[in-house]
Amino acid sequence: MPSFDIVSKVDMQEVDNAVNQAVKEIAQRYDFKGSKSEVTLEKDAIKVLTEDDFRLKAIIDILQSKFIKRGISAKALQYGKVENASGSMVRQVIDVQQGVSKEKGKEINNVIKETKLKVQSQIQDDQVRVTGKNIDDLQQVIQLLKGKDLGLDLQFVNFRQ
């Protein structure tokens, strides 16, 4: 029976490269000269610490452009709220999403069931497996999910016949 898996994975080496490129650009930019701005990568989170909201937005723009250049979708980033840190600094934590959460898995299941195609979908840990008798139905599901904005960067892997 043909099947495929829906996953949302990010290559952490590419994330590390993008963060390092952003740090280099921040160090060289004229509008950041003499300012205390930090961007650090810790496991699945990027921490941004800087002096004001203007610089924070500029750093986030730099990060997003570096992510896009490295082939990482901006949907993989989940922004925390802006917090005041000590010494009139502002901090924001940006989480890098790995895997499909249970809630998003249920949402994907509902989207697939609404199509009335003869396919079954089931949530397995951090992925969703879709099986069906007809390969064309599975390809229709892939096209449908690519067209929907679910707030995740979805990849379709393990396409088996």
Swiss-Prot record:
Pfam families found in the cross-reference section: DUF520 (PF04461)
An example molecular function term from Gene Ontology annotations: nucleotide binding
InterPro entries found in the cross-reference section: DUF520, UPF0234-like_C, UPF0234_N, YajQ-like_sf
Keyword Zinc found: no
GO cellular component annotations of the record: cytosol
Lineage top rank: taxon: Bacteria
Keyword annotations: Nucleotide-binding
Functional note: Nucleotide-binding protein.
Classification via PANTHER family: UPF0234 PROTEIN YAJQ (PTHR30476:SF0)
Family: Belongs to the YajQ family.
Listed HAMAP family: YajQ
Stated name of the protein: Nucleotide-binding protein Geob_0921
